[in-house]
């Protein structure tokens, strides 16, 4: 009897040991995650309450930096300009993105696939490239501005150097995100409701406004909030377009106060502004969660053996095609084309023949000047290494948070999503401070590895948003079956769960590579000889008036993104959309 009872006891003990075998790893992953996010937050938080830079031994406690948020006229003026900027960006992006998604995904518009491919270009381009292209094409001396003025006689047909002007450009840069969110929601709908409406005699417009758009409401809310967040965080477009004429938004004020040429940089005010920005973003994400709590009311789940029927545009087919073509050509192709053209000429002007101005000197400089070449190599290295390390770290975090019984898994889940509310400037500022005080990290100062840490913090939530849902879709029966034969948590994750999550992990890798190549704001505070990246180098060159090398670097950034994404998508079979 005693022997019979001891066998189950021993088996149960073995299973408990197997189940708990991953506790040390889970704890380590949790601690590393908290430390990384803490690096971005704590130093900047402390600086907000000091009257001098954090590294000054005589710095004293003060709340003046917080008071300045509501008392300083320069600061309060930026809130008004930022509100106007964000409003226009959201209006442009939502209007263009939603319309494009419906026309491409749910109508019989001619050339839908070609339009979608071109519409997504800005998704893979840094906002800096879009901004440079806008200045070259639509600035006061831009090609299209001069051509339009000559044709119509208008001396100033539009004003790019204004809050509405740069907001339209930023809205165009943000449109692909709205298009993707809405396109997926428009396509993946139960066709039975539309079929019933057609049987009842409803036409295309009635189906659109009474069925398709209401079901798309969660995607529209998500896109709306994301557009506001992106508008609040954007730095490059307001800096290169609004900076020369004195227009300041919240992000550009943070940038200016950090690099003041006269006097000491106001790091305390910078930290207060950064946390104000983070608080606004945090409130927006909270409102998004509230708005989407009842999102299931707008989703129909049914048999999808047939594809939703395309809405017939009828007599509006070719006018819609023309409007879409105008947007694609003048809102995307012209901007990218202007950058390519400027990279191949010493001057870009209607008064000078393109072929007379052709030169390869800018590319020669980019490939021969040490700083330019190093920024390209650093960006390539960070994209590949950062994408791989980031994916591995995201996978580890997601497995602990979603596929374990670890006591603090909910805390880890919250920590992993916290960087969503951290703008790139806040992350860069926090890592900058940490490099001066945190033992170990100070050894990485002025190296690309410090930039890599900032990137990993910045994009933790982005990767987590891809991998976490994929892990939740894998049944827990695999975990239970593995435990029944004595497999520990680590073995179960590495031998079963991770292989089943291959597609999500590859998608995460591609996304992180693209985001790292595009990123610039996190590296602004970390720029140093030897740690240059393409984004920060372009900003520096533009402020010096070197448009040619900037355009060549922008083209190199486009080419680098295209090559890496093409290789990965073709070899690994990852889909970039759909």
Give the location of each predicted region.
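Short, Lys/Arg-rich, polar N-terminal cytosolic tail immediately upstream
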Residues: 1-20
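Short helix-to-coil transition segments within interhelical loops
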Residues: 107, 186-190, 195-216, 404, ...
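Membrane-water interface segments at the C-terminal ends of transmembrane alpha-helices
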Residues: 21-55, 69-187, 215-236, 240-242, ...
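Juxtamembrane inter-helical linkers in multi-pass membrane proteins
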Residues: 203, 296-312, 347-363
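Short cytosolic juxtamembrane segments of multi-pass membrane proteins
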Residues: 193, 296-308, 478, 571-578
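Alpha-helical transmembrane segments of integral membrane proteins
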Residues: 11, 15, 287-324
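A short amphipathic helical element positioned immediately N-terminal to and/or at the very start
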Residues: 61-70, 208-209, 258, 358-367, ...
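Glycine-rich helix-loop "coupling/hinge" segments at transmembrane-helix boundaries
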Residues: 58-59, 136, 236-263, 351-356, ...
